[in-house]
Amino acid sequence: MWVLTPAAFAGKLLSVFRQPLSSLWRSLVPLFCWLRATFWLLATKRRKQQLVLRGPDETKEEEEDPPLPTTPTSVNYHFTRQCNYKCGFCFHTAKTSFVLPLEEAKRGLLLLKEAGMEKINFSGGEPFLQDRGEYLGKLVRFCKVELRLPSVSIVSNGSLIRERWFQNYGEYLDILAISCDSFDEEVNVLIGRGQGKKNHVENLQKLRRWCRDYRVAFKINSVINRFNVEEDMTEQIKALNPVRWKVFQCLLIEGENCGEDALREAERFVIGDEEFERFLERHKEVSCLVPESNQKMKDSYLILDEYMRFLNCRKGRKDPSKSILDVGVEEAIKFSGFDEKMFLKRGGKYIWSKADLKLDW
């Protein structure tokens, strides 16, 4: 018998099993393909589950959309702190006499328009005090004619407004809001809304007529405090028929009407939440009433001071940003403390153009 070498023996053995092994491999190939596909699908499913469980806070920064900048839809521009009244609870007092040059104020208003502003509200202080209302009138006309803002409004105590102002600028103004805290003249004097022999309530009625004559929507603002919280104003408000009656709860702001550096001491005017709610309940039949508690006031207004700085009131004081004239609107508004959700919740966005109000003049 022939004796085979190891190499020859291995070759002979391979030739014997080649066909069976080939057949076995062909039968196993589909199984291997199926197993590979199955494991790939399982791994993919596991990765997706892990992404879901991670949540939005654990996603990669590069996959997150950056937060959208706040849009200054409605801005309150307190261009002056000077006033001819001495309301005891005033929360924007005469701490400076500064007023921007007219062209600088216009530049700032243009920046706000470019950032998305739709409504501008001019306030103070008393806005009609500067240049006998001419400074204000020119800003009103600029905002309506050149910036084409849907809404231009003013908040005033009404004591310095003359009919000639309506003749010159009334067509450019959408809403005039007059501050009136009481229909009892003695209470007005006690609060600080008095000026010699002038009657605040009689002047209010005259302004209502002018607004009707010159097609300006009429609004009333009232601050509810210790001296008027028990008053019933239902009949008087209904007779004046404003488009809105804003009812504010007396608010303390450190450095303005309370604290060491304050020019007012408003603590004696403050009322509790329950007292404020009782006042609202007493006037629930007044359809134009728009209530605003302290919390809504602090967080839901974009307030611009005389230097065009946004004021953050969230901590019970006014912390200013840098001026929009220096850093732009998008950067300054980051420090405004503005709560857009609260702004919408309190009804901050409403029909505010007199063209859309469809009033019966």
Curated annotation (Swiss-Prot):
It is found in: Endoplasmic reticulum membrane; Golgi apparatus; Endoplasmic reticulum; Lipid droplet. SMART domains: Elp3 (SM00729). Pfam families: Fer4_12, Radical_SAM. The lineage of its organism: Eukaryota, Metazoa, Chordata, Craniata, Vertebrata. It is an enzyme of class 4 (lyase). Its EC number is 4.2.-.-. Homodimer. Interacts with IRAK1 and TRAF6. Interacts with FPPS. Interacts with HADHB. Interacts (via C-terminus) with VAPA/VAP33 (via C-terminus). Induction: By interferon type I, type II and bacterial lipopolysaccharides (LPS). Little or no induction by IFNG/IFN-gamma is observed in monocytic cell lines. Induced by infection with hepatitis C virus, yellow fever virus and Sendai virus, presumably through type I interferon pathway. Induction by infection with human cytomegalovirus (HCMV), stomatitis virus (VSV), chikungunya virus (CHIKV), Japanese encephalitis virus (JEV) occurs independent of the IFN pathway. It comes from Homo sapiens (Human). Its cofactor is [4Fe-4S] cluster. This is S-adenosylmethionine-dependent nucleotide dehydratase RSAD2. [4Fe-4S] cluster binds at residues 83, 87, 90. IRAK1 and TRAF6 synergistically activate RSAD2 increasing its activity with CTP as substrate about 10-fold.
